[in-house]
Amino acid sequence: MPVQTAVVVLAAGAGTRMRSKTPKVLHTLGGRTMLAHSLYAAAEVDPTHLVTVVGHDKERVGVAVSALEAELGRPIAIAVQDEQNGTGHAVECGLSALPADFRGTVLVTAADVPLLDGRTLHALVDEHHSEPTPSAVTVLTFTAPEPRGYGRIVRLPHDGEIAEIVEEADATEEQAAITEVNAGVYAFDAEFLRSALGQLNANNAQGELYLTDVVKIAREAGAPVFAAHLADSAKVAGANDRVQLSRLAAELNRRTVENWMRAGVTVVDPSTTWIDVGVTLARDVTIHPGVQLLGTTAVGEDAVIGPDTTLTDVTVGEGASVVRTHGSESTIGAGATVGPFSYLRPGTVLGASGKLGAFVETKNADIGAHTKVPHLTYVGDATIGEYSNIGASSVFVNYDGVAKSRTVVGSHVRTGSDTMFVAPVQVGDGAYTGAGTVLRFDVPPGALAVSGGKQRNIDGWVQRNRPGTAAAEAAAAAGLHHSSDLHETEKQDLKDGIEQ
């Protein structure tokens, strides 16, 4: 019968060195909080029970745990450590959330080691069960050339087995020189752990219940103690302040980018490319410098992203090109082109082979296949059919100061530059609009819509009103002459409007 496994994630600390109103475990890197990274790794073990121990700002951390419970699709019990009395006490609180008759392996990890992955936890469990006689405790260790801040692994001189873990504050000078250190990740036999926790005391420099003392208790009881040595120490590096967090974020990103490159993605400049862990990329995607792919962004085969592009929760179809664009919660169809300097706000859907060009902003807009919005246009709360073309400097006027309304433009529509769509309004299939048209009423299919009065030219206006200027001289050279026979109404026009 397979051995049951429970995972206890410690997330109760205050994290004062972050100097933040946000709990330490809710600071983010790679698109997830540190807590989320830890729970994702724990879930990969497929434990029978998953417990998070909360304490500082427990309500806020508890809400985050509940959200992750839905995201991971598995129950996560919450145990509360009201008084921060050391790691031993925290694990004791965690065990209280398990069934009283639970038998098996208890994995203990921390919520501030975001690079720890499920494979490492699997390896720890395998090591814990590797000998015929089950281990009471298996400790994950690593070698730290600069071991400051870590508990030291003290081994027996005659056989090299672990004798105890000594916290730095309690270490002798000789023990402080040891470079093998405790990673803070353990596998315990559940029955032994319950017994050992009851034997802990606070007779130490910190006045706390150390979980590490369980190792010494096991050794004194003659119970087996194993060690699993981790070569990749970055996986268990903690983030206690923002400097450490930024370093871990950079290391996580480096690993993420390199993994995608090995999977067939071209990243022209890895040093300026940031990819969240929730992003998915198909093979033969090309990413140019200065790109951020965030959240759950997904990019299809042969798409080209960048340079200087940020996409958050955006789906990009095969063969699309997205250049110098900022987009969020949008969909870009296969073969579409976007940019440069486009802004895709939430709810934008661009169909296959469509185009959003320079200085185009879209929001809550469904734009059909092969439709082009080439430049200098705002498209908000709109539906545009296939094979249409929206002229430059057009605006979908969707807000009347109280409510937003929708514009519907059909297929094969051609609109002149500077068309204003005053919503709610509909433009039928195959319709045209003249340049500068303000659409306040529906346009039937196949119609040409124009608006505005007849153009009037007032001859000689510059010479009369701007004499001696370069414009007047240029006009004179072009053969224009002062006109003295203006109609009285034209003079009034000048007085009332044009000169103003």
Swiss-Prot record:
It comes from the Bacteria. Its EC number is 2.7.7.23, 2.3.1.157. Residues 264-500 are annotated as: N-acetyltransferase. Residues 482-500 have a biased composition (Basic and acidic residues). Pfam families: NTP_transf_3. Catalyzes the last two sequential reactions in the de novo biosynthetic pathway for UDP-N-acetylglucosamine (UDP-GlcNAc). The C-terminal domain catalyzes the transfer of acetyl group from acetyl coenzyme A to glucosamine-1-phosphate (GlcN-1-P) to produce N-acetylglucosamine-1-phosphate (GlcNAc-1-P), which is converted into UDP-GlcNAc by the transfer of uridine 5-monophosphate (from uridine 5-triphosphate), a reaction catalyzed by the N-terminal domain. NCBIfam families: glmU (TIGR01173), PRK14352.1 (NF010932). Homotrimer. This is Bifunctional protein GlmU. It comes from Rhodococcus jostii (strain RHA1). The lineage of its organism: Bacteria, Bacillati, Actinomycetota, Actinomycetes, Mycobacteriales. The gene is glmU.
